């Protein structure tokens, strides 16, 4: 596990095109030279940008405070629910927020939550694949074996918890996860295997695997198809349909971004992975078209249009990949790859704010590299709190990025 307190090498990371003099940090470089052809000193630390951009987007969305509040005593969350009921019954417009009262408020401070922790979970699989445990396997088989080991280890915890509960769904687990992930783990615990674990799943369509796919892309920088295939292998544990298509799209976009730092190329790579006859395919093409035809005002200007034409207000959860992935691609396009524009705009779309800002941040962070992340956000978001995966508390994303960048699996030729 990666802990805070150690200094990561500033020069590690997959290489990106050289940035012209005077170009603002975070703006996409458009040098035609391929990343792998640049000298070592030109590295922009795109893996660091990817992880920190994802974490900053995760932190920027309003649900992050509720996720992080899980580290507070249960009675504080119960009181918040009671205050919400009071507001409803008494027609008051003063709405409650997560509270600390007489408890230390540290868990409620700005920082990453569940998306960043599940991204780190996948990053551990990359490091496992790069280690000696699976060194006798081929490159592709090592990654798939590491992913399978990680999921089955969690499923074993579910099985053990289920033995102490009347049914799998009510088992008390040492983790917090999306409905799709919990259902997938429950399926694994009962003996099912992918793709059944993702197909026989009430939330097969959500974007949980899309977040994981962002990290898996580092294994295939510049190879969108290979990155998408690996993301699909992982996604099948918890998703089906648009949930899988979205994972393929995000992996393809970020794999392209890691090698070219060209936002249009990255978005096109994502669209290639989205069948036109699917909801996510139709939404993504429409959203990107909106971004490209309304470029004057930047990302913030198209927020109302995306809200009215892409975001759905019918279902009880705003985590459908068919909404969040198109929003992320459109805002990255409208922001011209600038993380500091795409993430705040995504956070304005409150219904999809649980993951759309994280997806937009991952893509634009990979495009801009580690230096595109504002210093204050870097410090606030580099350390995981363990609100979803307690064993990851204290994990330093900057150090994790350096470790990922140093493995043979993340180099273009491996």
Where are these regions (language model features)?
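Structured, active/binding-site neighborhoods that engage oxygen-rich ligands
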Residues: 1-15, 22, 26-414
